[in-house]
Structures are given as structure tokens and as C-alpha cells.
């Protein structure tokens, strides 16, 4: 005698369960799509054109500001090549590199080919008034900690890396300014300071000798605006990445500086103007959202022009 199993009981229709499943599947797909988009946004960039009337200037000057390259971990020579090509296409009078040239995980001595590739690309930068750079905290080997918390051997190792990188850059025509300045024209002085947190930033030394010239101070960290002991006509910074990840209505989730100085045109408490670049590279995670990497092409004009 055969036994026929009864049909399984039908699963009751549960609208809430189906809605939850749809939400989970849709939410997962959305999160995945946003993740892919955030990674893609991190590798796109644009050229931002800005103007500023600078006291003391007698004729215009066009400068390009590239900052926060973070070469090494997520950024390779191909990205740097595209940035250099875009910069040269603008034919600036002056090119400035605003620090964090390499990522804190990058060991130049252990990766000589990568280091040579970086120097070769940056060596293509040419401008009538020169190419200048300053150090950022990642050039000190720091990702969010004080240099004083690092072991002595680690600090010595990174000092040697910076010395080697500085010499390599000099060989390619890029001058790193460490609390010093240069007279670029009879009406223009450029000063550059060491990193605010990891080094010893001295704006007075950087602007010493500027006289009556218009003054531009290159400083990686915009928080230098809170500690200035001099009064430059304009400060140019990076460091913040514009927050790197921004959300609609909320803005930046985290800013490694005074939140008043997240990005764009800002003023310090003394009224000194500054432009804070969103930078080009990434740190922490290889993502950006609503915060496109930028090269800033800044035209400085005489007052009233």
C-alpha cells in the first residue's frame, strides 16, 4: 500500500515580511552602488578656477595648487601623471604643492621604483616662477597622531625619508620650503611653513624679508590661521580633503581641522583670507563622496583689478 504525503501547507502571505525582504535587498544594492560610486569619485578630479585681489600685487599671476597627493597606498603614478598633465595644460606662472605628497604608509627606501616614478612625474612640472612645496603630516609618517608619540627610531627613519625625498624633489626642480620664503617677483613673496602638528611652523621666518611685496603663505594645515604671528596677504592650504566624505544636508562627517576651515574660501580670526583645497588623494579609506578632488587654478589680481 502506498502512502501519499499530504501537500505542504501553503505559506501564508505576509506583506510586512515581503516588504522587509525588498527593503533589505534594495538597501544592500543601494549600499553596494554607493560604495562603488564613492570609490569612483575618489579617482575623478576637476580644475577649480578662482580669483583673488591681493594687496601689494601690481600685475596678475596665475598659480596652480595641488595638495594631498597621498602617493603610495591608493594613489599611483598614473593618477599623478593625469594631475600633472591637467596642471601643465593650464600654463600657470607658479605651481605649489601643499603637503602630504606621500602617504604615511609609503616607504620610499623599500620601493625605489615607485619613488622614482613619483619624482619623474613631479619633475615634469614647470612654471616660469618655479615649483614649490611644503610638508604635511603624512610626510612625517603620521596618520592622526602626534610625532612625539612615535618611537625615536621611527622619527629618525621618517626624518631620513623626508631628507631623501627633499633631495630627490630638488633634483627635479621642486623646492621644499621649511619656514622660509622666496622673492618671486618685485611685487610677490612666497613663504612656506613646516607642518603645524608634526613640525614647527614659523610664519614669521617664512615671511621675513618680504618687505612691501604681496605675500602668499603656503601651509599644509589651515589651522595655521589660528596661530599666525604674522599677517600674510593670503594663506593656501589643504589637509582637510574637504571632509572627503560628505552627505546631503549634513556636510562633512569628519574634518581634521577647525570645521570653519573645511574647504574653499575662509578667513581666520584675524581676518586673514585663505583658500583650503579639497586636495587630490585619499586617506583612511579609498573613497570620496560629494567632495570631488581638485586642482586649484588661482588668478591673483592687483587690488581693484
Curated annotation (Swiss-Prot):
A divalent metal cation 2 binds at residues 100, 137, 239. Gene3D superfamilies: 3.60.21.10. InterPro entries: Calcineurin-like_PHP_ApaH, Metallo-depent_PP-like, Metallophosphoesterase_sf, TAT_signal. GO terms for biological process: lipid A biosynthetic process. The keyword Calcium does not apply. Its cofactor is a divalent metal cation. Predicted to be exported by the Tat system. The position of the signal peptide cleavage has not been experimentally proven. A divalent metal cation 1 binds at residues 68, 70, 100, 241. One of its GO terms (molecular function) is metal ion binding. Binds 2 divalent metal cations. Keywords: Hydrolase, Metal-binding, Signal. Pfam families: Metallophos. GO terms for cellular component: membrane. PANTHER family: PHOSPHODIESTERASE YAEI, TRANSMEMBRANE PROTEIN WITH METALLOPHOSPHOESTERASE DOMAIN-RELATED. Belongs to the metallophosphoesterase superfamily. This is Uncharacterized metallophosphoesterase DR_2345.
